């Protein structure tokens, strides 16, 4: 099981004209713990080829690689696991496809859903959107996000790692971890930064300080 402090979700269209490979290289240099291949606008073939490149980078750096939604691509690139949403395969089916050692994550916004995901065999939860974000089409039940307090309620309700996601930056990551999250997942806080390496390192420092408080 990896550390979860800083979890990067890739999205090249939000990467300020840089490639996802460039962003991930910087994030790895900055100490990222997990990289999730998202890239919603790309074809399966494009994600597969990008996934192979990211697998080589992350394996060399001992960083976990997760594929968003697509169990087939996760298996094809030998990723460490897959992250699933409401419209994706059920957790037990993904587990059957990827094997007992794979990491299977699940997106949730409510305590009951978190408990259900844990019972189904999820290894970790992505909880959000914590704050308002422009990377998704909606913000669950609240246009401003669910807030750190609900992240804490979910963390208290389960025994698996919880990662806050949605609108998180170095300026607001602290309260998410203080509420009980094991780490924070970000897109534009790193992909849109002038220096992805420094941005990743800064987020890691914020998470570490918040955990000590």
Label for each model-derived stretch:
Residues 11-12, 85-87:
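Structural motif
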Residues 86-96, 126-139, 167-206:
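Glycine-rich phosphate-binding active-site loops on the catalytic face of alpha/beta enzymes
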Residues 108-111, 144-148:
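Short, amphipathic alpha-helical segments
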Residues 148-154:
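Strongly charged, low-complexity linkers/loops
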């Amino acid at each position: 099981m990896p550390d979860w402090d800083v979890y990067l979700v890739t999205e090249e269209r939000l990467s300020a004209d840089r490639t996802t490979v460039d962003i991930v290289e910087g994030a790895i240099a900055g100490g990222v713990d997990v990289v999730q291949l998202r890239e919603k606008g790309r074809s399966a073939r494009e994600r597969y080829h990008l996934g192979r490149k990211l697998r080589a980078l992350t394996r060399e750096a001992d960083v976990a690689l997760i594929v968003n939604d697509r169990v087939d691509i996760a298996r094809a690139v030998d990723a460490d696991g897959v992250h699933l949403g409401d419209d994706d395969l059920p957790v037990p089916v993904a587990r059957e496809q990827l094997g007992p050692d794979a990491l299977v994550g699940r997106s949730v916004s409510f305590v009951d859903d978190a408990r259900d995901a844990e019972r189904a065999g999820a290894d970790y939860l992505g909880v959000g959107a914590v704050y308002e974000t422009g990377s998704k089409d909606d913000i669950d039940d609240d246009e401003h996000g669910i807030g750190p307090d609900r992240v804490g309620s979910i963390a208290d309700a389960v025994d698996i790692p919880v990662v806050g996601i949605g609108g998180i930056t170095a300026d607001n990551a602290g309260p998410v971890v203080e509420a009980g999250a094991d780490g924070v997942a970000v897109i534009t806080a790193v992909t849109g930064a002038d220096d992805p390496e420094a941005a990743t390192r800064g987020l890691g420092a914020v998470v570490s300080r918040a955990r000590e408080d």
